[in-house]
């Protein structure tokens, strides 16, 4: 957690990628943190590897990964298969499970 605070202090912009083209831009950018807002269980591992191979911290938005059930097992899948650094979700159970897996978490909520 301290590493991400240090990285954001130096480079406070976070890249959010929603397609393969934006992944290419993000890995070449100065952003140290990338939020992955797309993918499926078939390709999320490759997407995360590409981001991590560029030396970036990668969060996966679990709610937006096609084919991923929004249950506690989603956190374990994200930690083991794509080996992401963190999870974003609107679901409290997914966030709790991700923390228990040792992942950084962002609990996304909407205010009206």
Task: Give the positions of each predicted feature.
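Conserved N-terminal beta1-alpha1 strand-loop-helix module at the mouth
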Residues: 1-60, 66-68, 83
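Conserved anion-binding
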Residues: 50-81, 86-112
């Amino acid at each position: 957690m301290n590493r991400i605070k240090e990285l954001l202090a130096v480079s406070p912009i976070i890249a959010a990628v929603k397609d393969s083209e934006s992944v290419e831009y993000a890995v070449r950018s100065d952003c140290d943190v990338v939020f992955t807002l797309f993918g499926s269980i078939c390709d999320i591992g490759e997407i995360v590897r590409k981001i991590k191979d560029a030396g970036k911290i990668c969060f996966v938005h679990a709610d937006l990964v096609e084919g991923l059930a929004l249950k506690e097992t989603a956190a374990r899948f994200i930690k083991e298969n794509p080996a992401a650094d963190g999870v974003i979700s609107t679901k409290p159970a997914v966030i709790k499970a991700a923390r228990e897996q040792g992942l950084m978490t962002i609990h996304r909520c909407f205010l009206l």
